[in-house]
Design a protein with these regions (language model features):
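Beta-rich carbohydrate-recognition modules and glycan-binding surfaces
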Residues: 26-218
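Boundary/entry segment of secreted carbohydrate-active catalytic domains
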Residues: 40-44, 209-252, 263, 645
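Catalytic domains of carbohydrate-active enzymes, especially glycoside hydrolases
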Residues: 243-268, 343-344, 433
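Active-site groove signature of glycoside hydrolases
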Residues: 261-266, 332-369
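Aromatic- and acid-rich polysaccharide-binding/catalytic face
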Residues: 345-346, 352-356, 415-449
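Substrate-binding cleft of secreted/luminal carbohydrate-active enzymes
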Residues: 438-445, 459-656
Length: 656
């Protein structure tokens, strides 16, 4: 089981059942209840027949993988759920299946009073696999757990074999509320490698009721290979060294990379912001490395690879800095105008990530940032269409159209062009293509790439505008120490961003240091990432930067909160200690090097969650996930391909 996730757009995958049908099924009187109530056949997407979801269950060092597969099924058609667990001591792994829509705020639980058995079918890859069956009612949901009802061997006396067997779990002796059943968990609690296939989960009135077989489902049309895109940030050796260029393009051809998003820069790049520079009134300049680009692009075109100019920075989203990215757009257009057709860029792609700006945490400022961001992209698209034959696109996160847990509002909602909707939908309406940073280390499940990408693809199919690339992450960053100032309550934080700290609202870096914000539910704490081994000069700069943040956005710099600064600190420490993205928190006094004044603060180590990257996935497992993603996403007309972030880490994974 799991706690409820952020509410999302409630769309049933592949149109299998409408929400009205799901509710009607639940409201049917007991006399009309079918002998067999199907919960999950795994045939049609991630959401099941009663509105629930499934997802892998894991805690490091255990690794779990789930996939809906068509090669091992009950009967002649359909899908089953393949569950693979490498169970290690100290972790846990398996799969959970909910009987309610955990993405709907007030979703009803499942009433199974009229049923005597939970039923599901299982077969092993080798036989002998061991696991424990757990069930949960509504009371177990807040505990993020389920009640063990017995090892699988209790219900299968001969154990798991390589043939399909039905598991029947009697409900009469289970001490749960059968009027409000929440889910099923299969917990692989024996150390070792296990792979089983699960199918046709449901409830039966009697043990003799036959579980129907899947008759037919519409499978996606499978292709031998699918087009892909790839980000490339460190481009110099690829465009300037002939042998490396050949090697790079050979790799692209082998991996079916048809579109490259490659970092460009201008001759006068000193004018570009280091992270905190204010508005730059005039930014003009020619593209750097023109001769190298001409040679490289011509070579790429000869092997069927498109090249798009890539640039981006969070501060570019803000209106006062639009002249910088627009200068890049103009420079690429000018370069194309003076180049032969085979030497021209095929497009321009911006990766700005405006949600990294400090002001994003204030809803009013967030909407301003998003309006500015949309205005930038609309103008960039206009220039590209008016002055070239290129395409224009931008990267977005997958979660702007998900709802905030506290407000119920879309995370990226904004009024623009007479419509109030998520910025992701606005961008799909106006641009040639969109790269969705759909960063998860699994395709399947409630928290997988398919679930997070399908509402955007459905919208794009309906609107028939932008093509969508589904991004996948293969990089990982090492743990980074972050120093925080003891922060302010949300109201005071937002007031300061509009007042004394207004100059920080539109920054993602302060004095060159990348910022991080930790929200403990009551207070917002701003910090900076430290270099791995700061020099004495950097240490002085760190102290001055922390003092600046403390005076503007810290408890010790706010007259009304200053006396409670250490209380704020005591409140945040246990909360950041329980957050999986952080470890080793401890209090730290911040000293201003200018006047030696002290500010309350703390430090913690930032961790990249394994679930957002395939960096820890083996190459064969990565191939399987990519194949699954491409087959599932290809159902959508707007799907343009997977987009791989980024070249060096993906190549290292391929060559493991």
């Amino acid at each position: 089981m799991t706690t409820r996730l952020q509410p999302a757009l409630l769309l049933v995958l592949w149109g299998s059942l409408s929400l009205m049908e799901l509710q009607a099924q639940r409201d049917v009187g007991s006399a009309a209840r079918p002998d067999f109530l199907l919960v999950a056949s795994f045939d049609n997407g991630v959401q099941n027949a009663v509105g629930g979801y499934h997802n892998k269950l894991e805690r490091a060092p255990t690794v779990s993988v789930t996939a809906r597969v068509a090669d091992v099924v009950r009967g002649r058609s359909g899908r089953s759920l393949k569950v693979s667990v490498d169970r290690k001591a100290g972790g846990f792994g398996g799969v959970w299946i909910t009987f309610y829509n955990l993405k709907q705020k007030e979703s009803p639980y499942l009433d199974v009073r009229d049923y005597a058995y939970l039923s599901f079918w299982v077969r092993g890859a080798r036989g002998g696999e061991q696991l424990t069956v757990k069930l949960a009612d509504a009371s177990w949901v807040p505990r993020d757990d389920a009640l063990p009802v017995g090892p699988l061997s209790l219900f299968l006396p001969k154990g798991v074999t390589t043939e399909w067997q039905e598991v029947l779990v009697p409900l009469s002796g289970v001490k749960l509320n059968l009027e409000a059943m929440a889910g099923l968990t299969l917990d692989f609690d024996v150390v070792g490698r296990h792979t089983v296939y699960v199918d046709d989960v449901g409830f039966k009135q009697t043990a003799s009721v036959v579980t129907p077989l899947t008759q037919h489902i519409d499978e996606p049309v499978r292709k031998r290979e699918y087009d892909r895109a790839m980000w490339d940030w460190n481009i110099l050796s690829h465009i300037s060294d002939a042998s490396r260029m050949t090697d790079f393009l050979t790799f692209c051809k082998t991996e079916n990379i048809k579109t490259l998003w490659m970092q460009v820069s201008l001759e006068n790049s000193a004018l570009l912001p280091e992270g905190v520079r204010g508005a730059v009134k005039e930014v003009t300049g020619a593209l750097r490395n023109k001769a190298e680009w001409k040679s490289f692009i011509a070579a790429a075109h000869r092997v069927g690879v498109r090249v798009e100019a890539l640039d981006g920075f969070p501060e570019y989203a803000v209106k006062q800095n639009h002249n910088i990215p627009l200068a890049v757009v103009d420079a690429v257009i000018d370069y194309n105008g003076e180049s032969r057709p085979e030497e021209r860029f095929d497009g321009i792609h911006l990766d700005n990530e405006p949600y990294l700006l400090i002001g994003w945490r204030d809803w009013t400022i967030r909407e301003q940032i998003l309006r500015d961001f949309l205005e930038l992209n609309q103008e960039a698209q206009r220039r590209v269409r008016q002055h070239s034959h290129m395409v224009y696109g931008v990267d977005i996160p997958f979660w702007w159209q998900h709802r905030d847990q506290q407000t119920g509002e879309f995370n990226g909602v904004v009024d623009y062009n007479g419509s109030r909707q998520p910025a992701s939908f606005h961008l799909i309406d106006m641009l040639d293509n969109v790269g969705v940073m759909n960063y998860r280390n699994t395709v399947d499940g409630a928290d997988g790439m398919l679930e997070h990408g399908q509402d955007l693809l459905q919208y794009a199919d309906k609107r028939k505008r932008a093509k969508l690339f589904m991004g996948m992450e293969t990089s990982s960053f090492p743990p980074a120490t972050v120093w925080f100032v003891a922060g302010l309550p949300r109201k005071e934080f937002e007031e300061r961003l509009k007042g004394e700290a207004a100059d920080l609202a539109f920054r993602s870096r302060v004095n060159g240091f990348r910022t991080q914000i930790f929200d403990d539910g009551t207070n917002l704490h701003v910090g900076i990432e430290l270099p791995p081994t700061p020099t004495p000069e950097e240490q002085t700069k760190i102290g001055a930067t922390m003092a600046e943040i403390a005076e503007k956005l810290g408890a010790s710099g706010h007259p009304a909160v200053k006396s409670r600064a250490w209380d704020v600190l005591n409140y945040v420490l246990p909360r950041i200690a329980s957050d999986p993205e952080w470890k080793s928190p401890r209090a730290r006094s911040i000293t201003n090097p200018a006047d030696r004044s002290q500010h309350a603060g703390f430090e913690a180590v930032s961790i990249m969650l394994p679930k957002i990257t395939f960096a820890g996935t083996s190459h064969p497992e990565l191939r399987a996930e990519m194949k699954m993603a491409e087959e599932e996403f290809s159902r959508y007309q707007s799907y343009a391909g997977l987009a791989i972030h980024y070249y060096e880490t993906y190549r290292a994974k391929v060559e493991e």
